[in-house]
Amino acid sequence: MVMLADALVKRMIEVGALKFGDFVLSSGKRSRVYVDVKLASTFPDILEMISEGMAAKLKDLEFDRIACVELGGVPIAVALSLKMKKPLVIFRKEKKDYGIKGDRIGEVKEGEKVVVVEDVITTGSSALSAARRVEESGASVAAIIAVVDREESGRNFMSLLKLSDLIEAHDSIQPTES
């Protein structure tokens, strides 16, 4: 697992998924570091590493379904669904007012155990919102897992990487001035 995490970090840095500057995160917080897992997940090798890493972390967990919130978690949840042969539900951020007017694509059945997948967790509000919706459907949350935990939520979420791992790796491969 360590080798996979190292390879994932290296590839994420190579494709420019770790950015430095002044950013406003979806949580509303400001940060000097942005982790663009959406960009990273557009590369098949990275997406495969993510799904393999998550599958390894979840291998001993009993669950029936994978859930995510649009948009960032979708490619990751789809890849994990394919890898683990588990059905998927995608929660919309807002209920549609056209078509079938749903708040999700797919279903959650009463009594199921569901794993919620996220791209990046900062405060955890998006993941916890999905977890609440799972529970409102009569199912239970078996786990919440993210590609990157920014370590700002005050909670211990399952993740493949911590933001500090990415920054440390980035700093170690940058040329130093002599």
From Swiss-Prot:
Record carries keyword Magnesium: yes
Example GO BP: 'de novo' UMP biosynthetic process
This protein's pathway: Pyrimidine metabolism; UMP biosynthesis via de novo pathway; UMP from orotate: step 1/2
Sites where the protein binds 5-phospho-alpha-D-ribose 1-diphosphate: 92-93, 96, 118-126
Gene3D superfamilies: 3.40.50.2020
Pfam families: Pribosyltran
SUPFAM superfamilies (UniProt xref): PRTase-like (SSF53271)
Catalytic activity: orotidine 5'-phosphate + diphosphate = orotate + 5-phospho-alpha-D-ribose 1-diphosphate
EC number: 2.4.2.10
SUBUNIT field: Homodimer.
PANTHER family: OROTATE PHOSPHORIBOSYLTRANSFERASE, URIDINE 5'-MONOPHOSPHATE SYNTHASE
Protein name: Orotate phosphoribosyltransferase
Organism classification: Archaea, Methanobacteriati, Methanobacteriota, Archaeoglobi, Archaeoglobales
Name of the coding gene: pyrE
